[in-house]
Amino acid sequence: MGSSNSVCVGIDDVAIHFPRLYMDMKDFADLRGEDYGKLNKGLGLKAMSIPDVHEDTATMGANAVMKLIDRNGLNPKNIGRMYLGTESALDGAKPTATYIVDMLTQRYSERYGADCFRNCDVVDMTFACIGAVDAMHNTLDWVARSTDEDERIGIVIFSDNAKYALESAGEYTQGAGGGAILIRRNPRLLEIPDIIGVSTTPVHDFFKPRREVSVKSIISNVMTLAQEAGQSIKKGIVERMIRHLPASTVRKSVSYTHLRAHETASD
């Protein structure tokens, strides 16, 4: 990459997986009072994919990789790395890519052996919207070191389950899905030259997932559901219920900031 003596590397194939459940953007626009033309023609939004109860970042990524392997007749033992770009990791320490590899191993172990992915390097890359781009740059560099005796094959996975607060400004941009990109020498789809510009600057972004939930929000949601079911709820009942909860319950269920605010109000 980058000179006349460089090897040609790039994208050889792409596979995509979306959940079967979705919400039509016309229905969403009607529900939220949004301009459907803006969402559909302005932003190109047609539907909002929704993970089923058995789906998450790992399963969507695994399904995409499975399509890629089956369509190209790849032997898992020849796949040297699978790097995942995601903002929706399942674990704070264990890479979500390891969950993907575990599922793929279960699928292909009977044909290729229980250790078919044993020598495959996996890692998660998190950097807002460009995690998978960084994963691809790293994989391109790695594949570029291929030789005739050592043909390197890498897969870049991208998978996310984007969720925003109800009725928030970004709600209509949420959705879920995964994909897998096959990186190898002499690609059929797209050669990517070694001409890459880099610019990094710290900016504020949103943080997820939320690590705390207030007792008040839990009880309030339950009361709202009860009202929708036709129950009569007395005014101020949420606050009265919180006051009668054991102190240990409050400490375990709210963040330190919420607890201090409650103590100050009580004083």
Predicted features and spans:
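Condensing-enzyme catalytic core mediating Claisen C-C bond formation in acyl metabolism
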Residues: 1-54, 171-256
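Phosphate/pyrophosphate-binding loops at sites that engage ATP/ADP/AMP, CoA/4′-phosphopantetheine
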Residues: 64-79, 249-259
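Structural signature of cysteine-dependent C-C bond-forming condensing enzymes
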Residues: 70-80, 107-121, 143-157, 266
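Membrane helical hairpin/interfacial module
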Residues: 76-94, 100
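Acidic, glycine-rich active-site loops and adjacent beta-strand->loop/helix elements
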Residues: 85-91, 126-131, 158-163, 186
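Active-site-proximal alpha-helical scaffold in enzymes
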Residues: 123-151, 173-174, 181-187
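Single conserved hydrophobic/aromatic residue that forms the stacking wall/gate
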Residues: 258-267
